[in-house]
Amino acid sequence: MGAANDAVDGRELMSAAVVGRTISRIAHQIIEKTALDSPDSPRVVLLGIPTRGVILASRLAANIGEYSGIEVDHGALDITLYRDDLMSKPPRPLEETEIPAGGVDDALVILVDDVLYSGRSVRSALDALRDVGRPRSVQLAVLVDRGHRELPVRADYVGKNVPTARSESVHVQFSEHDGHDGVVISR
């Protein structure tokens, strides 16, 4: 997706304002679907898939805390060594896995990624999660679902469904990494 300040030419799908509203909406959906304010609600842990999934998880946790008054643990789950394309792509540096102090055992873990495409990153995340602990259940939240699944994966929380051609790319941009917020589609 490029390093910070790399320009991505293409058509804007979501402005910074729309990205903010979309994250807010996903946070509200998580609060409602998990019944976070109920005493029977499981502990919720948001685990972002590096790089932009970690940023999205952090923003979702902040929004959930603001709207519900409940602090939600969040962290990062590196999937590099669990990918099925390690031999066919250039080497990637390992990212940091940061599991909250309470761990993930018996928690509702929500995996968070910026774009859902083939489903292979999610499969890798499930494999990585298995090595970290045993959650009660696992859900998936994504900012953009662009279709073209190769594995039977469906997100529980989707910011925007964007039908794309396989020749197109969807680039999510966050100010923490890219200098500004937005979503761009390019060829």
Curated annotation (Swiss-Prot):
Enzyme's top EC category: transferase
For whether the record's keyword set contains Transferase, the answer is: yes
Spell out the SUPFAM superfamilies in the cross-references: PRTase-like
Catalytic activity of the protein: UMP + diphosphate = 5-phospho-alpha-D-ribose 1-diphosphate + uracil
Q: Which Gene3D superfamilies match?
A: 3.40.50.2020
Tell me the keywords, alphabetical order: Glycosyltransferase, Transcription, Transcription regulation, Transferase
Q: Which GO terms describe its molecular function?
A: uracil phosphoribosyltransferase activity
Q: What is its EC number?
A: 2.4.2.9
Keyword Transferase in the entry? The reply is yes
Where, by residue number, is the motif PRPP-binding?
109-121
In the record, biological process GO terms are: regulation of DNA-templated transcription
Q: Which InterPro entries match?
A: PRibTrfase_dom, PRTase-like, PyrR, PyrR_bifunctional
- State a single Pfam family of this protein: Pribosyltran
**What family, per the record?**
Belongs to the purine/pyrimidine phosphoribosyltransferase family. PyrR subfamily.
NCBIfam families xref list: PRK05205.1-3, PRK05205.1-5
Q: What role does it play?
A: Regulates the transcription of the pyrimidine nucleotide (pyr) operon in response to exogenous pyrimidines.
Question: What protein am I looking at?
Answer: Bifunctional protein PyrR
